[in-house]
Regions:
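Alpha/beta enzyme core
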Residues: 1-116, 129-137
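Generic beta-strand/beta-sheet core signal
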Residues: 24, 50, 88, 115-119, ...
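Metal-coordinating catalytic core of metallo-dependent amide/deamination hydrolases
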Residues: 68-69, 73-76, 80-83, 180, ...
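Catalytic alpha/beta core domains of metabolic enzymes, predominantly
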Residues: 90-287
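Proline-centered turn/helix-capping motifs that create local helix->coil transitions or kinks
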Residues: 189-193, 427, 440
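Terminal or standalone catalytic/regulatory effector modules within metabolic enzymes
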Residues: 199-205, 209, 213-438
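Structured functional modules or segments
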Residues: 445-447
Length: 447
């Protein structure tokens, strides 16, 4: 994003109550992080600068990202103004003994709190946290038990009990945590259709190295492309692509780039050898081309030059920091676009449009069509009301609507049903097009 968009977002987030900003770059590029660190400090907020973990510091064969690499980066982040150093282990690759060595080394290298974030995909995250606690880690990320494990974080309650008898056992109200977990235990089943998290440990993550937040998304993409029967091939190709790209650090957006290339290769039955042999006639995914152009920065130790030349097909890569090549956004022009959409013209709306123009536009259109459906309870939103059911909807503080569904009529020739309901005790009717019913009445063509 252009620098003025990044700065505006941080200022607005701080204004709206965000106190701690976790700042990371998908390629661990410090130059891409400086602007955010400086802006957060200008806002008198906490800049938590993250080093993204990949590889295995215990494996001498994976020496690109060794212990010295992470220690040196932590020192650079501290010098750049970070208040906290985060270890962002987005795929859950940090093994227990590696966490002890890494946290110990960082505690010796910088006089800042160390915050560890990992995922439970391998099943080893609790042990990883326990060893990090032994090494002096200051903060770890956990999840409520009902939302934990799989590609999520380990359970906070489980960690509490795992550290029983340890001098650094967290001083938390575990009964209150368990009560909150029971709430999420009730809510989670409503989202089952979108919940593709594996409910069992899968140490294969140490092989494919796919971030926890990407695993389910890529699986859905594979399903949409008709590749779910070849999911094992996709996972294998994901790792192959990562190594082709130079043993890449994989976190948004670099992880998506690797995923796009893996799907592209499996869908087209391409091997690594095919890429080098036929690359001049292949139409690579846009995200892959932009990556090799340097639009998200330059990987540690640079691009694999031969592959870069094949993908770019004679185009020149960018020079310098990507943000320096982007002109500032004209916020007044964005306000004019919001006016055309009949969207609220607020600082937050402008920033949202700058960050996600299509998503924001689709959301505005949906609100225009259906109103603010976020006020509905989850079962009603997903499944609708049953005949005789009554719900209460708070549309703003102190303003409650009581709605009761009374009757749904038969569909007419146009596929229209009359829905009868009570609105705050008063009878109402509305005609709704049933999209599951084919109209039997033929419409006359206009002249």
């Amino acid at each position: 994003y252009p620098d003025n968009v990044v700065k505006e977002f941080i200022h607005l987030a701080a204004k709206n109550g965000v106190d701690v900003f976790r700042i990371f770059d998908s390629l661990n590029g410090l130059d891409n992080m400086r602007l955010s660190i400086d802006t957060v400090r200008e806002c008198n907020k906490v800049a938590e600068a993250a080093l993204c973990y990949t590889g295995d510091i215990l494996d001498p064969r994976r020496d690109k990202y060794d212990l010295k690499y992470y220690v040196d980066m932590a020192k650079e982040l501290a010098a750049a103004g970070a208040n906290i150093i985060a270890i962002k282990d987005m795929a859950g690759l940090l093994k227990p003994e590696a966490s002890y060595r890494l946290v110990s080394a960082l505690k010796d290298a910088v006089d800042l709190p160390i915050h560890l974030h990992t995922h439970e995909g391998s099943g080893n995250a609790i042990y990883t946290y326990a060893r990090a606690v032994d090494a002096g880690v200051d903060i770890v990320d956990t999840a409520m038990s009902a939302m934990s494990c799989g590609t999520s974080q380990p359970s906070g309650s489980s960690l509490y009990y795992a550290l029983s008898g340890h001098p650094r056992q967290p001083r938390v109200d575990v009964d209150a945590m368990n009560e909150l977990s029971r709430y999420w235990e009730t809510v989670r089943p409503y989202y089952k259709a979108a919940d593709q998290t594996e409910l069992f440990p899968n140490p294969e993550v140490y092989v494919h190295e796919m971030p926890g937040g990407q695993y389910t998304n890529l699986k859905q993409q594979a399903t949409a492309l008709g590749l779910i029967e070849r999911w094992e091939e996709v996972k294998d190709m994901y790792h192959r692509v990562s190594m082709m790209f130079g043993d890449l650090i994989k976190v948004t957006p670099s992880s998506k780039i690797v995923g796009d290339m893996a799907l592209f290769m499996v869908q087209n039955d391409l091997s690594e050898e095919d890429i080098y042999a036929k690359g001049d006639v292949l139409d690579f995914p846009a995200s892959v081309v932009e990556f090799f152009e340097g639009r998200i920065g330059v990987p540690y130790q640079g691009f694999p030059q031969k592959l870069q030349q094949i993908v770019l097909k004679g185009r020149k890569p960018l020079e310098g920091r990507p943000g320096d090549t982007l002109p500032p956004v004209n916020f007044e022009e964005i306000k004019a676009k919001l006016a055309e959409l009949e969207a609220p013209i607020t600082e937050e709306a402008v920033s949202s449009y700058c960050l996600y123009p299509k998503v924001f536009t689709d959301w505005v259109k949906r609100v225009h069509d259906f109103g603010d459906v976020s006020v509905l309870d989850t079962p009603t939103f997903f499944f609708g009301m049953k005949i005789g059911e009554e719900i209460k909807v708070e549309i703003e503080q102190g303003k409650m609507l009581v709605i009761k569904l009374v009757h749904i009529g038969e569909a007419n020739a146009d596929g229209i049903r009359t829905v009868s309901f009570e609105f705050n005790g008063l009878p109402r009717e509305i005609d709704i097009k049933d999209r599951n019913v084919k109209a039997t009445k033929k419409k006359k063509k206009k002249a």
